[in-house]
């Protein structure tokens, strides 16, 4: 079978339990810039990848919470090219009281990273490339 021809991931979409809380976290707290907003949806770029955040639908369970151990998404990792940026980001997460691991070294690849959770407990990493 021939390999799929793609320049990379175009976008990811995450469902949130609270649209306004998610918007405050990603836009106001983390500083991403909204590039498109429609009812119950906003999109920002993380590097060259669009990240779409959707609010809950009528069928979204009211007490639902992300679980990285279910089949599906485990976490999202953003690339970091400067160790000073990694340290600044860690300090920002701490100042915002965002749950995080502190800067660690990945045992598999030997790269530094910090893992954190958004308000719906979706796992993210800021990872040295």
What do the predicted segments below correspond to?
Residues 49-53, 61, 120-123:
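Short, charged/polar, Gly/Pro-enriched secondary-structure boundary elements
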Residues 1-4, 90-129:
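Vicinal oxygen chelate
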Residues 20-21, 83-88:
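Short, conserved charged micro-motifs
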Residues 58-64, 102:
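A short, acidic/glycine-rich surface segment
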Residues 4, 36, 67-70:
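A generic structural micro-feature
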Residues 1-20, 73-76:
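N-terminal beta-strand motif that seeds the catalytic metal site of vicinal oxygen chelate
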């Amino acid at each position: 079978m021939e390999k799929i021809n793609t320049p990379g991931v175009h976008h990811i979409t995450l469902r949130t339990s609270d649209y306004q809380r998610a918007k405050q976290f990603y836009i106001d707290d983390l500083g991403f810039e909204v590039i498109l907003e429609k009812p119950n949806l906003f999109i920002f770029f993380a590097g060259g990848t669009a990240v779409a955040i959707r609010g809950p639908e009528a069928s979204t369970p009211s007490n639902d919470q992300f679980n990285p151990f279910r089949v599906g998404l485990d976490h999202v990792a953003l690339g970091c090219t400067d160790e000073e940026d990694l340290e600044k980001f860690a300090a920002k997460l701490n100042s915002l009281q965002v749950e995080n691991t502190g800067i660690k070294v990945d045992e598999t690849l030997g790269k530094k990273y910090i893992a954190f959770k958004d308000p719906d407990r979706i796992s993210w990493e800021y990872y040295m490339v």
